[in-house]
Amino acid sequence: MFITDEHWRVLKPILEPAQAPRRGRPWKDSRAVLEAIFFILHTGIQWEHLPKSFPPKSTVHDRLQLWSGNHAFRKLLAKVVRSLAQKGRIDLDQCFIDATFAPAKGGGEGVGLTKKGKGTKLQLIVDGQGLPLGASLAAANVAEWHMVQETLDLFSDQTEPERLIGDKAYDCDELDETLAELGLEMIAPHRKNRRPENVTQDGRPLRRYRHRWIVERTFAWLGARRRLLVRWEKKLTNFVGFTLLGCLSLLLHRLS
Protein backbone atom coordinates (compact mmCIF):
# COMPACT_ATOMS: atom_id res chain seq x y z
CA MET A 1 0.00 0.00 0.00
CA PHE A 2 1.41 3.36 -1.06
CA ILE A 3 -1.28 5.63 0.41
CA THR A 4 -2.07 5.77 4.13
CA ASP A 5 -5.32 7.08 5.60
CA GLU A 6 -3.50 10.26 6.60
CA HIS A 7 -2.22 10.76 3.06
CA TRP A 8 -5.67 10.19 1.59
CA ARG A 9 -7.23 12.87 3.78
CA VAL A 10 -4.86 15.33 2.09
CA LEU A 11 -5.24 13.98 -1.44
CA LYS A 12 -8.96 13.21 -1.56
CA PRO A 13 -10.37 16.78 -1.84
CA ILE A 14 -8.50 17.29 -5.12
CA LEU A 15 -8.89 13.81 -6.63
CA GLU A 16 -12.35 12.76 -5.51
CA PRO A 17 -15.25 14.53 -7.26
CA ALA A 18 -17.86 16.12 -5.02
CA GLN A 19 -20.44 14.37 -7.17
CA ALA A 20 -19.85 11.26 -9.29
CA PRO A 21 -20.51 11.61 -13.04
CA ARG A 22 -24.16 10.95 -13.92
CA ARG A 23 -23.39 9.38 -17.28
CA GLY A 24 -21.25 6.42 -18.24
CA ARG A 25 -19.87 3.76 -15.95
CA PRO A 26 -19.89 4.14 -12.16
CA TRP A 27 -16.98 6.21 -10.83
CA LYS A 28 -14.32 3.82 -9.54
CA ASP A 29 -12.80 4.35 -6.10
CA SER A 30 -10.18 7.07 -6.63
CA ARG A 31 -7.94 5.78 -3.87
CA ALA A 32 -7.72 2.33 -5.47
CA VAL A 33 -7.02 3.89 -8.86
CA LEU A 34 -4.27 6.08 -7.41
CA GLU A 35 -2.74 3.03 -5.71
CA ALA A 36 -2.60 1.37 -9.15
CA ILE A 37 -0.89 4.41 -10.69
CA PHE A 38 1.66 4.44 -7.87
CA PHE A 39 2.25 0.71 -8.47
CA ILE A 40 3.04 1.35 -12.13
CA LEU A 41 5.22 4.32 -11.18
CA HIS A 42 7.33 2.28 -8.76
CA THR A 43 7.57 -1.00 -10.69
CA GLY A 44 7.66 0.34 -14.25
CA ILE A 45 5.47 -2.51 -15.49
CA GLN A 46 3.52 -2.29 -18.73
CA TRP A 47 -0.15 -1.45 -18.52
CA GLU A 48 -1.28 -4.90 -19.65
CA HIS A 49 0.60 -6.48 -16.73
CA LEU A 50 -1.24 -4.51 -14.05
CA PRO A 51 -2.36 -7.11 -11.44
CA LYS A 52 -6.06 -7.92 -11.34
CA SER A 53 -6.18 -6.86 -7.68
CA PHE A 54 -6.25 -3.27 -9.00
CA PRO A 55 -9.05 -1.60 -11.00
CA PRO A 56 -9.06 -2.35 -14.76
CA LYS A 57 -6.07 -0.97 -16.67
CA SER A 58 -8.37 1.07 -18.93
CA THR A 59 -9.88 2.80 -15.89
CA VAL A 60 -6.47 3.48 -14.38
CA HIS A 61 -5.07 4.83 -17.66
CA ASP A 62 -8.12 7.04 -18.24
CA ARG A 63 -7.83 8.48 -14.74
CA LEU A 64 -4.10 9.12 -15.20
CA GLN A 65 -4.94 11.13 -18.31
CA LEU A 66 -7.73 12.97 -16.52
CA TRP A 67 -5.67 13.92 -13.48
CA SER A 68 -2.64 14.81 -15.60
CA GLY A 69 -4.73 16.89 -17.98
CA ASN A 70 -6.65 18.84 -15.33
CA HIS A 71 -3.44 19.55 -13.35
CA ALA A 72 -4.64 17.60 -10.31
CA PHE A 73 -1.13 16.26 -9.68
CA ARG A 74 0.33 19.77 -9.90
CA LYS A 75 -2.23 20.95 -7.35
CA LEU A 76 -1.43 18.03 -5.06
CA LEU A 77 2.31 18.70 -5.14
CA ALA A 78 1.77 22.41 -4.44
CA LYS A 79 -0.64 21.59 -1.60
CA VAL A 80 1.73 19.17 0.12
CA VAL A 81 4.72 21.51 -0.28
CA ARG A 82 2.67 24.35 1.18
CA SER A 83 1.58 22.18 4.11
CA LEU A 84 5.16 21.15 4.85
CA ALA A 85 6.31 24.78 4.63
CA GLN A 86 3.67 25.81 7.17
CA LYS A 87 5.01 23.13 9.52
CA GLY A 88 8.57 24.39 9.08
CA ARG A 89 9.71 21.21 7.32
CA ILE A 90 10.94 22.89 4.12
CA ASP A 91 14.36 24.58 3.91
CA LEU A 92 13.93 27.57 1.58
CA ASP A 93 17.16 29.33 2.52
CA GLN A 94 18.91 27.71 -0.42
CA CYS A 95 17.28 25.63 -3.13
CA PHE A 96 18.97 23.71 -5.91
CA ILE A 97 18.04 23.35 -9.56
CA ASP A 98 19.18 20.87 -12.18
CA ALA A 99 17.89 18.81 -15.09
CA THR A 100 18.32 15.27 -16.34
CA PHE A 101 17.65 13.35 -19.54
CA ALA A 102 14.96 10.68 -19.94
CA PRO A 103 15.21 8.67 -23.18
CA ALA A 104 11.92 8.46 -25.07
CA LYS A 105 11.94 4.99 -26.61
CA GLY A 106 8.54 5.34 -28.23
CA GLY A 107 8.76 8.95 -29.36
CA GLY A 108 5.77 11.20 -28.77
CA GLU A 109 5.11 14.81 -27.80
CA GLY A 110 7.87 16.99 -26.38
CA VAL A 111 10.74 14.82 -27.60
CA GLY A 112 14.02 16.43 -28.69
CA LEU A 113 17.13 15.06 -30.37
CA THR A 114 20.47 15.32 -28.53
CA LYS A 115 23.82 13.55 -28.57
CA LYS A 116 22.28 11.03 -26.17
CA GLY A 117 19.44 10.33 -28.58
CA LYS A 118 15.76 11.29 -28.53
CA GLY A 119 14.34 12.19 -25.17
CA THR A 120 12.77 14.56 -22.71
CA LYS A 121 14.42 16.87 -20.21
CA LEU A 122 13.24 16.85 -16.58
CA GLN A 123 14.04 19.86 -14.43
CA LEU A 124 13.75 19.86 -10.64
CA ILE A 125 13.93 22.46 -7.92
CA VAL A 126 14.62 20.96 -4.49
CA ASP A 127 14.96 22.49 -1.05
CA GLY A 128 18.08 22.36 1.12
CA GLN A 129 17.22 18.80 2.17
CA GLY A 130 16.59 17.57 -1.36
CA LEU A 131 12.80 17.57 -1.15
CA PRO A 132 11.29 18.25 -4.61
CA LEU A 133 9.37 21.53 -4.68
CA GLY A 134 8.75 21.90 -8.40
CA ALA A 135 9.27 20.04 -11.66
CA SER A 136 8.81 20.68 -15.36
CA LEU A 137 9.50 18.79 -18.58
CA ALA A 138 10.47 19.86 -22.08
CA ALA A 139 12.09 18.46 -25.20
CA ALA A 140 15.65 17.36 -24.46
CA ASN A 141 17.14 20.02 -26.76
CA VAL A 142 15.57 22.95 -24.85
CA ALA A 143 18.04 25.09 -22.86
CA GLU A 144 17.64 24.54 -19.13
CA TRP A 145 17.38 28.21 -18.25
CA HIS A 146 14.33 28.52 -20.50
CA MET A 147 12.49 26.02 -18.26
CA VAL A 148 13.04 27.78 -14.93
CA GLN A 149 9.92 29.95 -14.96
CA GLU A 150 7.62 27.00 -15.63
CA THR A 151 9.23 25.06 -12.78
CA LEU A 152 8.77 28.02 -10.45
CA ASP A 153 5.11 28.35 -11.42
CA LEU A 154 4.29 25.52 -9.00
CA PHE A 155 5.35 27.68 -6.09
CA SER A 156 3.15 29.85 -3.91
CA ASP A 157 4.16 32.93 -1.93
CA GLN A 158 4.70 30.69 1.09
CA THR A 159 7.15 28.41 -0.69
CA GLU A 160 9.27 30.75 -2.81
CA PRO A 161 13.00 30.08 -2.31
CA GLU A 162 15.40 32.84 -1.37
CA ARG A 163 18.11 31.69 -3.76
CA LEU A 164 18.56 29.10 -6.49
CA ILE A 165 21.84 27.25 -6.99
CA GLY A 166 22.59 25.60 -10.31
CA ASP A 167 25.42 24.66 -12.64
CA LYS A 168 26.81 26.57 -15.64
CA ALA A 169 23.66 25.86 -17.65
CA TYR A 170 21.98 28.57 -15.54
CA ASP A 171 24.64 31.24 -16.07
CA CYS A 172 22.46 33.66 -18.03
CA ASP A 173 22.08 37.42 -17.53
CA GLU A 174 18.47 37.37 -18.73
CA LEU A 175 17.62 34.67 -16.19
CA ASP A 176 19.43 36.57 -13.43
CA GLU A 177 17.40 39.69 -14.17
CA THR A 178 14.09 37.83 -14.34
CA LEU A 179 14.68 36.09 -11.02
CA ALA A 180 15.94 39.28 -9.38
CA GLU A 181 12.60 40.91 -10.19
CA LEU A 182 10.99 38.07 -8.23
CA GLY A 183 13.32 38.67 -5.31
CA LEU A 184 15.29 35.51 -6.00
CA GLU A 185 19.07 35.23 -6.28
CA MET A 186 20.54 32.90 -8.92
CA ILE A 187 23.90 31.39 -8.01
CA ALA A 188 25.75 29.56 -10.79
CA PRO A 189 29.39 29.33 -11.88
CA HIS A 190 30.21 31.27 -15.02
CA ARG A 191 30.55 29.70 -18.44
CA LYS A 192 34.05 29.70 -19.92
CA ASN A 193 33.06 32.15 -22.65
CA ARG A 194 31.90 34.90 -20.24
CA ARG A 195 34.03 38.02 -20.54
CA PRO A 196 35.86 39.24 -17.41
CA GLU A 197 34.09 42.61 -17.50
CA ASN A 198 30.71 40.82 -17.33
CA VAL A 199 31.45 38.71 -14.25
CA THR A 200 28.46 38.66 -11.86
CA GLN A 201 29.51 36.02 -9.32
CA ASP A 202 32.29 36.04 -6.76
CA GLY A 203 33.60 33.30 -4.52
CA ARG A 204 31.35 33.95 -1.53
CA PRO A 205 27.95 32.96 -2.96
CA LEU A 206 29.58 30.16 -4.95
CA ARG A 207 30.55 28.42 -1.72
CA ARG A 208 26.99 27.15 -1.67
CA TYR A 209 27.56 25.47 -5.04
CA ARG A 210 29.53 22.65 -3.44
CA HIS A 211 26.24 21.33 -2.01
CA ARG A 212 24.78 20.65 -5.47
CA TRP A 213 25.04 16.94 -4.74
CA ILE A 214 21.74 17.42 -2.90
CA VAL A 215 19.72 17.78 -6.11
CA GLU A 216 21.70 14.98 -7.76
CA ARG A 217 20.68 12.72 -4.86
CA THR A 218 17.03 13.63 -5.45
CA PHE A 219 17.31 12.48 -9.06
CA ALA A 220 18.68 9.19 -7.71
CA TRP A 221 15.66 8.91 -5.39
CA LEU A 222 13.34 9.47 -8.34
CA GLY A 223 15.26 6.86 -10.30
CA ALA A 224 13.91 4.26 -7.88
CA ARG A 225 10.52 5.00 -9.49
CA ARG A 226 11.23 2.82 -12.50
CA ARG A 227 8.54 4.35 -14.72
CA LEU A 228 10.63 7.54 -14.82
CA LEU A 229 13.86 5.94 -16.06
CA VAL A 230 12.59 5.67 -19.64
CA ARG A 231 9.69 7.61 -21.06
CA TRP A 232 7.14 5.28 -22.66
CA GLU A 233 4.18 7.68 -22.63
CA LYS A 234 3.34 9.17 -26.02
CA LYS A 235 1.56 12.09 -24.38
CA LEU A 236 3.87 14.47 -22.57
CA THR A 237 1.14 15.30 -20.02
CA ASN A 238 1.01 11.66 -18.92
CA PHE A 239 4.77 11.54 -18.33
CA VAL A 240 4.48 14.84 -16.46
CA GLY A 241 1.81 13.20 -14.31
CA PHE A 242 4.08 10.28 -13.42
CA THR A 243 6.93 12.70 -12.68
CA LEU A 244 4.84 14.85 -10.34
CA LEU A 245 3.59 11.71 -8.59
CA GLY A 246 7.20 10.62 -8.15
CA CYS A 247 7.95 13.95 -6.48
CA LEU A 248 4.80 13.64 -4.38
CA SER A 249 5.81 10.18 -3.17
CA LEU A 250 9.03 11.67 -1.76
CA LEU A 251 7.05 14.25 0.21
CA LEU A 252 4.10 12.31 1.61
CA HIS A 253 5.99 10.52 4.37
CA ARG A 254 7.16 13.91 5.68
CA LEU A 255 3.56 14.86 6.48
CA SER A 256 3.39 12.47 9.44
Give residue spans per PLM region.
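Short alpha-helical elements
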Residues: 1-256
